[in-house]
Amino acid sequence: MQHESPTHGMNMSALRRHKQRLDLADETVAIEVPGLNLFYGDKQALFDIALNIPKQKVTSFIGPSGCGKSTLLRSFNRMNDLVDGCRIEGAINLYGHNIYTKGEEVAELRRRVGMVFQKPNPFPKTIYENVVYGLRIQGINKKRVLDEAVEWALKAAALWDEVKDRLHESALGLSGGQQQRLVIARTIAVEPEVLLLDEPCSALDPISTLKVEELIYELKSKYTIVIVTHNMQQAARVSDYTAFMYMGKLVEFGDTDTLFTNPAKKQTEDYITGRYG
């Protein structure tokens, strides 16, 4: 009996998509993008994106400004729904389930797929109330449960020792780096499965950046992490896999060491060596 290859009968576009995706067993894929196009009104922002995001690894998106990195990231928890005129063609599967299915509970999706933005955005509340905010929304108000969640989340975010004696002080009194780690604590307090980080260190000093990078390394044992960064050195330091994007297209995707030391595409090499971008 003849066995056809997985690519038999594919057109060239589909074949290119197949080759870009990592060959991972189903149980090791957190997010599968089999072929995504995204539009803002009449303008197409993402073109035929296909990739698999590995579970409990750090995947970074790199590329010049405006290449679609953040747009792709925000599609993973449907933040783009908030932009007028945004529509997609295709699917994004979170552990095998298409998150763009009609009737999808978007609030629950955003609990499962948490997001940390470029600029730290603590609420004008106490440190304690920042961490428990999402839990209270879920109807959890028992003090013992909240206390345990605060300690656990702040320890996981490497912030507990710095703030444990000031939990009932305003979060706005923290440094920028502390605020960003607090936001991460707030995000993981509701026990997501995926963390999306949109340039989380761009507003931080080098010491704070190092602490956040160390935190990312610690968190990947429990969470799937996807990070957008303009800092290629940061991508090389913290990520297991890297995707290079240009003008809304996925140029190359693979393990970080290989992509940075032996890229398959000249366009990737030109970008990481500073020839453009």
From Swiss-Prot:
GO terms for biological process: phosphate ion transmembrane transport. Its main location: membrane. Transmembrane segments: none annotated. Disulfide bonds: none annotated. Gene3D superfamilies: P-loop containing nucleotide triphosphate hydrolases. ATP binds at G63, P64, S65, G66, C67, G68, K69, S70. It is an enzyme of class 7 (translocase). GO terms for cellular component: plasma membrane. Its EC number is 7.3.2.1. It is found in: Cell inner membrane. It catalyses: phosphate(out) + ATP + H2O = ADP + 2 phosphate(in) + H(+). Keywords: ATP-binding, Cell inner membrane, Cell membrane, Membrane, Nucleotide-binding, Phosphate transport, Translocase, Transport. It comes from the Bacteria. Signal peptide: none annotated. This is Phosphate import ATP-binding protein PstB 2. It comes from Pseudomonas savastanoi pv. phaseolicola (strain 1448A / Race 6). The lineage of its organism: Bacteria, Pseudomonadati, Pseudomonadota, Gammaproteobacteria, Pseudomonadales. The gene is pstB2.
